[in-house]
Amino acid sequence: MRRKNSDLKDSTTASHAAAWRQQLHSRLKEGVLIALGALCLYLWMALLTYDSADPSWSHSSQVDQVQNAAGRLGAVSADILFMTLGYFAYLFPLLLGIKTWQVFRRRNLPWEWNTWLFSWRLVGLIFLILAGSALAYIHFHASGHMPASASAGGAIGQSLGRVAVDALNVQGSTLVFFALFLFGLTVFADLSWFKVMDVTGKITLDFFELIQNAFNRWMGARAERKQLVAQLREVDERVAEVVAPSVPDRREQSKAKERLLEREEALAKHMSEREKRPPPKIDPPPSPKAPEPSKRVLKEKQAPLFVDTAVEGTLPPLSLLDPAEVKQKSYSPESLEAMSRLLEIKLKEFGVEVSVDSVHPGPVITRFEIQPAAGVKVSRISNLAKDLARSLAVISVRVVEVIPGKTTVGIEIPNEDRQMVRFSEVLSSPEYDEHKSTVPLALGHDIGGRPIITDLAKMPHLLVAGTTGSGKSVGVNAMLLSILFKSTPSEARLIMIDPKMLELSIYEGIPHLLCPVVTDMKEAANALRWSVAEMERRYRLMAAMGVRNLAGFNRKVKDAEEAGTPLTDPLFRRESPDDEPPQLSTLPTIVVVVDEFADMMMIVGKKVEELIARIAQKARAAGIHLILATQRPSVDVITGLIKANIPTRIAFQVSSKIDSRTILDQGGAEQLLGHGDMLYLPPGTGLPIRVHGAFVSDDEVHRVVEAWKLRGAPDYIEDILAGVDEGGGGGGSFDGGDGSGEGSEDDPLYDEAVRFVTESRRASISAVQRKLKIGYNRAARMIEAMEMAGVVTPMNTNGSREVIAPAPVRD
């Protein structure tokens, strides 16, 4: 028991001793820091009050009274620092004080001696002293406040500066010593320049915010003063009414009555004008009921129920899409009128006199059309967009400066409860059903809830841009499904280029594809070259037929088939008198979709820009259209050449006005709400239309793709991805020939090529080229020799051949 008590007593004594030592160590540390701080102040005082007449280290003096505030020791210390460091002597106490303050801030942390860290701090201090003194010697001259024999950099700076200037000149020496100075400051003071920039930026922003808040408070106080003055005047008038009868002076009493009558007349006039002023015209809010279905929807509802297989050549039903949700009741006319009055009040607080003329509520935003007072510039209202958003407590406010056919200015304010626009709503509308184009694009609803259906053939190309998460990919899916619900593979074909390998790969296997979804950027360039070659081939074909566009060509072919006299290919080259030209068939519209052409331009280079520009310039009449999408709307991606040839653009939400101007040549996209909210710039106009994009889920896309796969397999043209000469035809002359003069029936590989073609039933030049590992020109001559020998048929209008000869019998 005694042993336990003694052990407990010893442990208690040890703990008390440890605590006492820790407390003593903390107090000693504080004392040392106080002493160092006092030393810094003492040196600073000695330097500031230095007098060259005082006795010092560099010279003697007979003066009895020392002028230096730090005394004789201070005069000697200042003289030594000036003679050694020059002007840098002023910074030496400051650096010592900074390090003292840094240690003082960590006084409560456990202190451990670190030789490595102390050595680096000492190296940093040495670099600071050497570089600072040298810079002072190079760029400054000694003043009368310093010793007569001292230079601006002291003895250290003078020695280093002379050597450095002789070797590196003034500019080079400055660069080297400045870098050493910054390095020394970083190591000695543990300073991060990135943190310095962050702190500086934050201080600057806080300063400007402080000024802005002070200005807003001043404006608010000014408005309150004006309101208070008006109230005081009204009180004075009321008091005058009561006091006036008791005034003995008849003359003053009559003047008071006259002033009162004038005020009453002015008040009555103002009230009558306010009552006569009509309330703002409020459009009826979008009906919560479902819109009237189109004829196609009604027809699909009456379709037979026991049809298990999809019929080839038919369109998938719209029932594959998710049904539209029931709309909730939106704002009442009273709330919209109150909102319009609030908007007038807020603008008046900012010094802009307006009146709300009409209100147009929509599913996502509400547009207030305001009539500015005489002399009010629209730019003043546009500059108040962010202030209005703050004062109205909304995400963003977009100002429409010009409304065609009206003198009003539009202010678009987001609704509190945003309604989702389902894709089935847009496709079920009569506008989509009655659209005659084979490549319609269902974008969504406008601000009033009406469906927006555009024609890609009239655009004829489209540029889509927006930041990540703005709804760009969903918008591209909606455009593709618009085409798939309207056109069969004989009417529209697709070439999809997907550098990200995620967005468009879901469409792999649908019969509309001319080639597999392209994910290799080299093959993407080949696909664009094939498109250029197909464009040239179609132009030659239409020129020979005497038509001006693809619609005229297809109409002429159909009329000839109905008349029983089908047309033949005018570009067919007869190899023998027995050869018959193939019959012409209608040509489909080709849509080239590039999901992220910024990545394609980065990998392939400027050649892609030239191919895109060439297609955009000439491919409209040939029925080839581009849809280019990117999430990086910068000038090196959306170049002037591309913008000049693609006037139709869609901008989703972007991060800055610069990006909006890059896409639309005007601002506005930075004020969108995201999630499919877009600005659509139609061809031939400079005024964008705000559209709320329709939402398409991944499940809906999968259902539509599976429905098309049941209706047929894709008929790929393999030559598309092999590389085609732009001057060739649709089956084109591809690059990569080996220059061999062989290729006829005398070619040693001809028999092997025939065996491969007849066994695989693929009469493709690129397939022979890959199988035999030969150049394109040699493989092309082999295929031509097979055509002359009757092994394969001549080239069809779509660039493919059929194998006639049977496969050889193997032993």
Curated annotation (Swiss-Prot):
Membrane topology of the entry: Multi-pass membrane protein
Q: Where are the transmembrane segments?
A: 31-53, 73-95, 116-138, 148-165, 172-194
Q: What would be one Pfam family of this protein?
A: FtsK_SpoIIIE
> Would I find Membrane among this entry's keywords?
yes
Q: What is this protein called?
A: DNA translocase FtsK
The text of the family note is: Belongs to the FtsK/SpoIIIE/SftA family.
Which residues lie in Pro residues bias regions? 281-291
Primary site of residence: membrane
Q: Does the keyword Cell membrane apply?
A: yes
The annotated regions of Basic and acidic residues compositional bias extend over 269-280
What are the FtsK domain coordinates in residue numbering? 449-661
The species this protein was found in:
Pseudomonas aeruginosa (strain ATCC 15692 / DSM 22644 / CIP 104116 / JCM 14847 / LMG 12228 / 1C / PRS 101 / PAO1)
Q: According to the UniProt topology, which residue ranges lie Cytoplasmic?
A: 195-811
Q: Where is the composition biased (Gly residues)?
A: 728-742
Extract the ranges annotated as region (Disordered).
269-296, 728-748
Q: Which GO terms describe its biological process?
A: cell division; cellular response to antibiotic; chromosome segregation
Q: Which Gene3D superfamilies match?
A: 3.30.980.40, P-loop containing nucleotide triphosphate hydrolases, Winged helix-like DNA-binding domain superfamily/Winged helix DNA-binding domain
Q: Share the domain note from the entry.
A: Consists of an N-terminal domain, which is sufficient for the localization to the septal ring and is required for cell division, followed by a linker domain, and a C-terminal domain, which forms the translocation motor involved in chromosome segregation. The C-terminal domain can be further subdivided into alpha, beta and gamma subdomains. The alpha and beta subdomains multimerise to produce a hexameric ring, contain the nucleotide binding motif and form the DNA pump.
Q: Where does ATP bind?
A: 469-474, 675, 693-694
**What InterPro entries does this protein's entry cite?**
FtsK/SpoIIIE/SftA, FtsK_4TM, FtsK_alpha, FtsK_dom, Ftsk_gamma, P-loop_NTPase, WH-like_DNA-bd_sf, WH_DNA-bd_sf
Compartments (UniProt record): Cell inner membrane
What this protein is reported to do is described as: Essential cell division protein that coordinates cell division and chromosome segregation. The N-terminus is involved in assembly of the cell-division machinery. The C-terminus functions as a DNA motor that moves dsDNA in an ATP-dependent manner towards the dif recombination site, which is located within the replication terminus region. Translocation stops specifically at Xer-dif sites, where FtsK interacts with the Xer recombinase, allowing activation of chromosome unlinking by recombination. FtsK orienting polar sequences (KOPS) guide the direction of DNA translocation.
Summarize subunit and interaction data from the UniProt record for this chain: Homohexamer. Forms a ring that surrounds DNA.
Q: Which UniProt keywords apply?
A: ATP-binding, Cell cycle, Cell division, Cell inner membrane, Cell membrane, Chromosome partition, DNA-binding, Membrane, Nucleotide-binding, Transmembrane, Transmembrane helix
An example Gene Ontology cellular component term from the record?
plasma membrane
Entry superkingdom:
Bacteria
GO MF term list: ATP binding; DNA binding; DNA translocase activity
